[in-house]
């Protein structure tokens, strides 16, 4: 199911049309999953948009990258303001999902990521109603086992960990 992306995104500190936010094919995160994300809900009450637990989300956002020495080069306040700002820029008047993420950028094919690796940050939003179909869902139990918490910090919201959830 493809959801409509917001017209504007926040990318590396600037608001821009979504189609202008581009990354090179040598972006490290594409090859190795070195991305950090949050999923934030915001609820429209008919008058105002309320972002759910923004401060807690921003703190976890930064902490997830610290597990892997991936730097978030914006302050928590700048990220929180960008989350609110992208909702305003897109004139959001209904409940929505906000996806901030940062990732190791044009770092090439290298397995050794350091805190000096270039990072990019983006935030976008889209309308998000019910997560599941009101008529029910189909579910299954798979035979795959999750990674052990001893093998990788599974509590970090990282792109490389997401398939394990």
Language model features by range: what are they?
Residues 101-105:
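Short loop/turn motifs enriched for small/polar and acidic residues
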């Amino acid at each position: 199911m493809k959801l409509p992306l917001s017209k504007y995104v926040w990318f590396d500190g600037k608001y821009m049309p979504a189609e202008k936010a581009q990354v090179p094919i040598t972006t490290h995160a594409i090859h190795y999953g070195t991305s950090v994300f949050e999923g934030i809900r915001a609820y429209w009450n008919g008058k105002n948009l309320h972002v759910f637990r923004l401060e807690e989300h921003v703190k976890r956002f930064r902490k997830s990258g610290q597990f892997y020495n991936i730097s978030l080069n914006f302050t928590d306040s700048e990220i929180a303001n960008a989350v609110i700002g992208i909702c305003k820029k897109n004139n959001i008047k209904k409940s929505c999902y906000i996806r901030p993420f940062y990732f190791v950028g044009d770092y090439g094919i290298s397995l050794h990521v350091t805190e000096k690796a270039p990072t990019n940050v983006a935030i976008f939003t889209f309308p998000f109603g019910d997560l599941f179909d009101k008529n029910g869902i189909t579910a299954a139990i798979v035979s795959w086992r999750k990674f052990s918490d001893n093998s990788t910090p599974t509590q970090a919201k990282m792109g490389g960990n997401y398939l394990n959830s």
